[in-house]
């Protein structure tokens, strides 16, 4: 099978209020996440190691591109995420008022995902997956129901998530998105038509009430079993779940954790169950995995971003002594942060031109700004390039490079500061919150022990704002272990090239021991000659922990001196930077290829 699972249906943008305890009316800022039951399950399933595709539509606008790009980043196949030129991507506002109140307002009238049609797929696509999952909302309208039934007809197995939202069936006023149950014979009849076709049905007790046409759970299940041979999975919140297969009933206890946010927990539960069910695991194991995923998601802000990774799930299941408030577990949150939602960077070849003091010696601010724009223009001609750019003189260059899929970092340190100081002042978290999420936080530190406090403040700010951190140490024998011992675990290190394989092995050993999820090491340049850099590359390329380089003055400084002296034209600067950068890229890749060939 090409896919383990195809998820069909809702795909939206969730705007989550960030003020916990406030009414939705009183929210002053929102976090933007991917949302929609099937999209959440797609992300959760992909994070648990399944091959997943999404079948839906999005608008031809910014939110639609956000949905598609987020799914793709999560490893979900988006080849069947169609762009609808006439409709907008669905939108939902949500908030957390208290432990029992979770207001939400849907903006879904004539939205893109409700226009999904049989023209968006073929039998071969549906048949290429072990199972097709569709949620109940898409059976609320005739045209989408027709498309979904056409897909179900071609599915190897059909998973039905009841996903009952009365407001989306037109049973409440538009502002009552939070209401979970309204009895309706019409809805019951429609859902039962679908359940006759299902192999697996997942829902809350309230959802089985509407599906079975009775507010007595046992009676509702009996009615459903008379018309469907599907395995029925009843989500019971903190109590866990029950699984009903024929005459067999399995009860699986939940995990004792604080309920922080119920929104999305059921989707995490479904992903956890499917991660076992699609592999033929015993139903008891499927239920245990489902309850664990639900417990992890219910402890967090957001839906899709809260879904656990496989590593995180296994860690959670390996122990029973977790804090009641799971989100306060440093270990779990660290593993979650470093194993989910991150683009893979197997190679980073960055041109570092965040230099400030060195260029201030050559010319006035406006000339520095102009020069950095030229460097950025040279870099844009390369696919897969990376850059480190400052805000002070490189803001325009930074804007030009952002949003292009490049690896980008920007500095926070005051150049040359000893002890370490930040350009944005002490409230570094507030400054980082205004940065694009794709920007890596780079901090060059002339390390002394007194800098550990500042580095820890910076690390905590990066964790709180969801930013990656690169620490640059311009010294031989960098004190990585000492920094790790202070609770600081950067995503990246930027280091001078060690002189021996033994020195590289020592660095690898420390990183693997202290933070196996570290992205890796980038080599700095220190205005070394190309020959010197190539020798360093040849050694570094033998060690997988080194992912590439972040070199600056070796590439652009000669051109800068001539350009600031009016001895070089703009075009010549661009040409020289292009040539020097391309030469280093070729040297690195040649060194890495030689190592790979020697291993094979």
Summary of predicted features, one role per range:
Residues 171-173, 180-192, 215, 398-400, ...:
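Distinct, well-ordered alpha-helical segments
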Residues 371-377, 426-440, 448, 454-455, ...:
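Alpha/beta enzyme core
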């Amino acid at each position: 099978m090409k896919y383990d699972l195809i998820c069909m249906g809702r795909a939206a943008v969730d705007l989550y209020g960030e003020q916990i305890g406030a009414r939705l009316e009183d929210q002053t800022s929102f976090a933007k996440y991917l949302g929609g039951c099937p999209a959440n399950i797609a992300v959760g399933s992909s994070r648990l190691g399944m091959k997943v595709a999404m079948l839906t539509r999005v608008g031809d606008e910014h939110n639609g591109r956000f949905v598609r790009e987020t799914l793709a980043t999560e490893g979900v196949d988006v080849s069947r995420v169609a762009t609808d030129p006439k409709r907008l991507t669905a939108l939902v506002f949500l908030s957390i008022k208290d432990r029992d109140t979770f207001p939400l307002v849907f903006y879904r009238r004539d939205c893109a995902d409700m226009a999904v049609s049989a023209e968006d797929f073929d039998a071969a696509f549906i048949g290429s997956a072990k199972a097709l999952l569709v949620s109940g909302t898409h059976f609320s309208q005739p045209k989408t129901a027709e498309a979904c039934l056409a897909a179900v007809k071609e599915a190897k197995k059909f998973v039905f998530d009841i996903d009952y939202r009365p407001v989306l069936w037109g049973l409440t006023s538009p502002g009552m998105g939070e209401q979970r149950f309204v009895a309706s014979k019409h809805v019951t009849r429609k859902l039962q038509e679908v359940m006759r076709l299902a192999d697996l049905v997942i829902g809350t007790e309230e959802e089985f009430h509407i599906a079975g046409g009775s507010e007595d759970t046992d009676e509702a299940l009996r009615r459903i079993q008379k018309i469907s041979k599907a395995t029925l999975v009843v989500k019971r919140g903190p109590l866990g779940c029950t699984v009903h297969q024929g005459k067999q009933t399995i009860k699986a206890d939940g995990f004792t954790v604080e309920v922080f946010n119920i929104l999305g927990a059921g989707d995490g539960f479904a992903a956890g169950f499917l991660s076992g069910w699609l592999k033929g695991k015993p139903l008891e194991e499927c239920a245990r995995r489902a309850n664990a995923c639900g417990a992890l998601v219910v402890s967090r802000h957001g839906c899709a971003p809260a879904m656990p990774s496989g590593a995180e799930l296994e860690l959670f299941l390996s122990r029973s002594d977790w804090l009641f408030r799971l989100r306060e577990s440093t270990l779990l949150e660290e593993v979650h942060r470093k194993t989910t939602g991150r683009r893979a960077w197997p190679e980073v070849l960055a041109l570092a031109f965040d230099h400030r003091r060195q260029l201030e010696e050559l010319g006035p601010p406006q000339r520095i700004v102009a020069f950095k724009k030229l460097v950025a223009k040279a870099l844009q001609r390369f696919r897969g390039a990376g850059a480190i750019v400052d805000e002070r003189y490189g803001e325009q260059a930074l804007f030009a490079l952002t949003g292009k899929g490049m690896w980008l970092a920007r500095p926070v340190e005051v150049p040359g500061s000893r002890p370490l100081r930040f350009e944005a002042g002490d409230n570094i978290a507030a400054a980082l919150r205004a940065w694009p999420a794709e920007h890596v936080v780079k901090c060059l530190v002339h390390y002394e022990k007194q800098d550990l406090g500042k580095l820890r403040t910076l690390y905590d700010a990066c964790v709180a704002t969801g930013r990656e951190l690169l620490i640059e140490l311009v010294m031989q024998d960098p004190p990585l272990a000492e920094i790790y011992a202070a609770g600081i675990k950067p995503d990246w290190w930027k280091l001078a090239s060690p002189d021996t394989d033994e020195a590289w092995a020592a660095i690898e050993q420390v990183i693997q021991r202290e933070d196996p999820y570290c992205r890796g090491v980038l080599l700095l340049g220190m205005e070394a000659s190309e020959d010197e850099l190539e020798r360093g590359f040849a050694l570094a390329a033998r060690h997988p922990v080194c992912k590439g380089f972040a070199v600056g003055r070796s590439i652009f400084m000669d051109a800068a001196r001539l350009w600031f002296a009016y001895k070089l034209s703009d075009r010549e600067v661009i040409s020289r930077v292009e040539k020097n950068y391309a030469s280093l890229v070729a040297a690195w890749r040649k060194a890495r290829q030689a190592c790979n060939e020697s291993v094979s």
